[in-house]
């Protein structure tokens, strides 16, 4: 892989050290066909590719997506959603950025990607992978338009490399680009999944009619999972864009529904009845046929409803998003103006109870949903992607972007998820007999546990309290999730806090003599409220050093984090802490900063409790404890108490006083 040659600009242009023009940004394991081009790919800036580069075209059709050598049709189909909404486009690509003709141009590009409940700003340079001087991955219909390849590069940076984008779900990319919801509709049904269905049923026809009302409001994508014999030109596991639908009156008076399909490959691969010059066009007026054929861009073709339902396997539909940021129901077109979200986790041995087949199901995370008025409600469980190995963490020293919402190379999402489901019970009041409630049939639930990043329920709910229980299929399967609620009416969402053994407030210390240190601190927005280790701002959290003295062996240490709020206050923040051991002699030059390394011990997942603590054995040495809230920019005050057992022989009085004395020595109180 070589760096591309071009004219050296008069001013130095930005080079992204966190995502360099190197093999590490292209490949993850050289497992895809992309590896064969390793020695031929060069990196060039847009002004080195063409004379007058532009971010956006004057004619939207010139910005149409085209796929290159990378197998990321799923992401490119989702990008087409941005072309339907100026609001979404401005949300993802902030307007006003200096471009190549501007004096302020410095060779950088910033966009926003929605990640696990937050819009994250990601900045990279504009050096793009090329073959023989041309873009080798995504490009627009006009090759002097660069919004798409630049956005693709940012998305590759979020995932760790371009190769990580090889294969994925359109629905996942749609959520990342809109912050909303997406649905996948199976066009074949259960019977058709085995290839036994030749003619579409009434449900599938109703689905296509429904798309007529959605085509201008949201992205519609379709895919082929396993092409029929004789239709191999569509490809396998390939995603397409449904760019238009038209309902026509045939010459014989019949109703004909046509769908215009765009192939991201940029070539017309359809050989059906409604191909250009196909016999299907004889069924409609010649002027109508001419008009529809003239609308086709490169890579587009028309297909009739019956053919579409026979040849395609699945539809993905993104929920419309208004300029105010509200989702719109696909089924009723009502606005889902009320939203709530809370994080949660399945922890092995504690809260990973498995599905309803397991006796441990009641130990799963549980949430109260209060519905104040009759509402159409969507409840979604979004899994946090598992992280790749920490070999990317060394790049964290070169973070780019907004400090409190920036992307962290230490948090590169993976593509492996647990099989998850969600069930909902209605209860009369919040104080319930939990085993009895969970033994009853739920009022709503997912049909099965699915290996999808996000699953959701759609419900028409009457006012009252509901118990929501997200679960993995297997017991003790760990994972983190975000529970999201979208509703037409007012709702509230709260977590049911389980009392854990190591989080009991005011737990007594074991017998013996203890030295106690109390450290007071606070989390402040934009300063010391860095959030959990999932966020790049984590190192800004308060950090307290402490030491364990030499002794005959490890010392027993209890660390307690107490947040300052009233016990009756329902607005507890989810809190936790990590303990890092400071290396003897200091950090080596090649090692990442201490807080970007793996902690020695942790008190996680973050819990909605006033106090969390952990009792541990620590060898002599220097340590740092970092208390944090789960989300960044969550303000609050706290006290960290570090109690260290003092190992020395007990002194007994020769005079029996009737009761031995236990000494507790208060060593220091530090305010920060």
UniProtKB/Swiss-Prot annotation:
Entry-linked CDD domains: Calpain_III, CysPc
Pfam family of the protein (one): Peptidase_C2
EC numbers: 3.4.22.-
Tissue expression per record: Detected in primary skeletal muscle cells (at protein level). Ubiquitous.
Active site (record annotation): 73, 238, 263
EC category: hydrolase
InterPro entries, per the entry: C2_III, Calpain_cysteine_protease, Calpain_domain_III, Calpain_III, Calpain_III_sf, Papain-like_cys_pep_sf, Pept_cys_AS, Peptidase_C2_calpain_cat
GO biological process, one term: positive regulation of intracellular transport
Chain positions covered by the region annotation Domain III 1: 322-494
Family listed: Belongs to the peptidase C2 family.
Recorded disease: Type 2 diabetes mellitus 1: A multifactorial disorder of glucose homeostasis caused by a lack of sensitivity to insulin. Affected individuals usually have an obese body habitus and manifestations of a metabolic syndrome characterized by diabetes, insulin resistance, hypertension and hypertriglyceridemia. The disease results in long-term complications that affect the eyes, kidneys, nerves, and blood vessels.
Name this polypeptide is given: Calpain-10
Organism: Homo sapiens (Human)
